[in-house]
Amino acid sequence: AGIDDDSQVVFYSSGHMMWATRAWWMLYSCGHKQVAVLDGGLEKWKAENRDLSMDAGSYTAGQMRVNLDAERWVNKEQTAAAIEDGGICTINALAPGVYSGEADMHYGRRGHIENSKNLYYDTMMNEGCFKPAEDLRQNFEESGVWGTPRVIAYCGGGISATIDAMALTLIGHDNVAIYDGSMSEWVKDESLPLITGS
């Protein structure tokens, strides 16, 4: 069957888990809380010799009501306003070299949003799975993110940032948003600053 209000939904990816976490975030932000991600994705599932099907399946339409939680998404203006807001921590999920501006950035201008902290999405993972909760929490505590009331995560285009967002949600932070436009949008506006260095 399709997705109903009481359906348990599990997303998985045949590639990097960020594609599943992006789908998870979209449904989660639409008010559907019975949604999960298969840790390790299809690769781990296959490595464990679990059942697979080649059947495409046929499903009737579901009746899920969308109750969008607008607080789970922010735009360019809200992200810019957060730069000087001590109650909001902005985190960049890209690789350290991209964050600092030292590595090539195919989005355009190099650097990161002012006052944002670098929490590379890959540091949340271990062999394709999320790290244990205590390790995730340590990541966010050591970076100074954990005690902040609200967190905005961004990346290149709103995909890998959902790894950080899910990690925060898994350890109990309930006020996380994604800047959906991320660097793909930010770099195009020359009036918006970018900071280089770590």
Predicted features and spans:
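Short, well-ordered beta-to-alpha junction loops that form the rim of enzyme active sites
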Residues: 14, 93-95, 155-156
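Positively charged, proline/Ser/Thr-rich regional signature most characteristic
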Residues: 1-6, 75, 80-148, 188, ...
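Thiolate-centered catalytic microenvironments shared by cysteine-dependent enzyme domains
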Residues: 1-82, 102, 160-177, 181-182
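A secondary-structure boundary/capping signal
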Residues: 38, 120-121, 155, 179
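C-terminal appended segment following the main domain
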Residues: 138, 142-198
